[in-house]
């Protein structure tokens, strides 16, 4: 099974570092919630801690939207635990509020299409999975550029809005902004107001 937008997310069960201990984490555990699954290439590297720390610091915002952030790496759970024990000022993570999944056999990275086989590391994939287990969004960055927490949160809020209200969202939409009724006639209301 390969991850695709509008398809069921590949299931997984992995050992994770959660609040300083090891815990088995599965996608099934979060059924009924949105899941933001993000992959990082390597523990103790450079861009990765900035991403995990930023998403961890924003964990409450995602929780308030009924979403759980998960990070996955091809490192072992022991490496990930050691990384959380290293202070942030030294390039570590310190305590984090998001589970860190150990994908040491690379099955998760492979199933989600982010594994660089030759190097045994993952590209910076970000997947938004809805409460029914359907993938709604995929982005995959090269190794050198980190992701944007606010954009990930905006996408979760956007998918939730469209699911609830049946409207579609224009470019650069933010919560509270105008939406579009997906109908040839009714959509004209949006375009009339947007182009005055």
UniProtKB/Swiss-Prot annotation:
Keyword Disulfide bond included in the entry's annotation: yes
Assigned EC number: 1.11.1.24
Ranges where the Thioredoxin domain occurs: 3-161
Enzyme class: oxidoreductase
Sites of Phosphothreonine modification: 174
Induction remarks: By peroxides.
Crosslinked residue numbers (Glycyl lysine isopeptide (Lys-Gly) (interchain with G-Cter in ubiquitin)): 14, 89, 132
Keywords associated with the record: Antioxidant, Cytoplasm, Disulfide bond, Isopeptide bond, Oxidoreductase, Peroxidase, Phosphoprotein, Redox-active center, Ubl conjugation
Compartments, record wording: Cytoplasm
Residues at the active site: 48
Source domain of life: Eukaryota
Entry annotated with the keyword Acyltransferase: no
Pfam families tied to this protein: 1-cysPrx_C (PF10417), AhpC-TSA (PF00578)
Cellular component GO terms, alphabetical: cytoplasm; cytosol
UniProt subunit comment: Homodimer; disulfide-linked, upon oxidation.
PANTHER family, alphabetized: PEROXIREDOXIN 4, THIOREDOXIN PEROXIDASE
More info: The active site is a conserved redox-active cysteine residue, the peroxidatic cysteine (C(P)), which makes the nucleophilic attack on the peroxide substrate. The peroxide oxidizes the C(P)-SH to cysteine sulfenic acid (C(P)-SOH), which then reacts with another cysteine residue, the resolving cysteine (C(R)), to form a disulfide bridge. The disulfide is subsequently reduced by an appropriate electron donor to complete the catalytic cycle. In this typical 2-Cys peroxiredoxin, C(R) is provided by the other dimeric subunit to form an intersubunit disulfide.
Protein's UniProt name: Peroxiredoxin TSA2
Organism: Saccharomyces cerevisiae (strain ATCC 204508 / S288c)
Gene from which this protein is expressed: TSA2
């Amino acid at each position: 099974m390969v991850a695709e937008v509008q398809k069921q997310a590949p299931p997984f069960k992995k050992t994770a570092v959660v609040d300083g201990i090891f815990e088995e984490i599965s996608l099934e555990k979060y059924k009924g919630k949105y899941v933001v699954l993000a992959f990082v290439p390597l523990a103790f590297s450079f861009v990765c801690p900035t991403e995990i720390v930023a998403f961890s610091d924003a964990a409450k915002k995602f929780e308030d939207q009924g979403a759980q952030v998960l990070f996955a790496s091809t490192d072992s759970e022991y490496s990930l635990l050691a990384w959380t024990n290293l202070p942030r000022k030294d390039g570590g993570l310190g305590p984090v509020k998001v589970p860190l999944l150990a994908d040491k056999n690379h099955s998760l990275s492979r199933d989600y299409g982010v594994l660089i086989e030759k190097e045994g590391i993952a590209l910076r994939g970000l997947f938004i999975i809805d409460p029914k287990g359907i993938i709604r969004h995929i982005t995959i960055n090269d190794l050198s550029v980190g992701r944007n927490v606010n954009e990930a949160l905006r996408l979760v809020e956007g998918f939730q809005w469209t699911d609830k209200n049946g409207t579609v969202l224009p470019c650069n939409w933010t919560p509270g902004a105008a939406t579009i009724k997906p109908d040839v006639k009714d959509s004209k209301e949006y375009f009339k107001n947007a182009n005055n």
